[in-house]
């Protein structure tokens, strides 16, 4: 995990069509985290955020598809739709072309929105040679205020990029 930036910069230098590179991530316990996502459906978010664990187990395959569990741990791909905001290595010219983050998002969905807008000017890549330790996350599990902020940003995201109730990418 020592040379994440060097690996990312080298990847961007040899792949000029990439607008954003997302790394391989582990939490503090060394467990893999899934930073790349497919376009979500409302149903997937409801199951992921609010369903009891028994129901989540029933939809385990659907959730794994959303979180792109099928990505290789050794081979980069430029077939990513959304990258987590915990680490985004972006080309400055591409970020400037879309005017950066949309200030209308607060705390949630700003990374989803940025990823989709960057995909309009380049590709989003998963680069497993870039390795990080991510100790954050789970901000959605912090009470009703966060649920309200999540819902507000979610409505903004889906109003902007399109509502999908059951079908995900």
Where are these regions (language model features)?
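Residues that scaffold the ATP/ADP-binding catalytic core of kinase and kinase-like folds
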Residues: 35, 46-49, 97-98, 117, ...
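Short, flexible active-site-adjacent loop segments at beta-strand->alpha-helix junctions, enriched
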Residues: 24-27, 36-39, 86, 111, ...
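Conserved donor NDP-sugar-binding/catalytic core segment of glycosyltransferases
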Residues: 2-37
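Active-site-adjacent helix/loop segment of glycosyltransferases
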Residues: 112-116, 120-169
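A short, conserved alpha-helix in the catalytic core of glycosyltransferases
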Residues: 3, 72-76, 81-100, 104-131
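Short, flexible, basic/aromatic active-site loop/helix in glycosyltransferases
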Residues: 40-80
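Short, hinge-like loop/turn segments at secondary-structure boundaries
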Residues: 36-42, 142-145
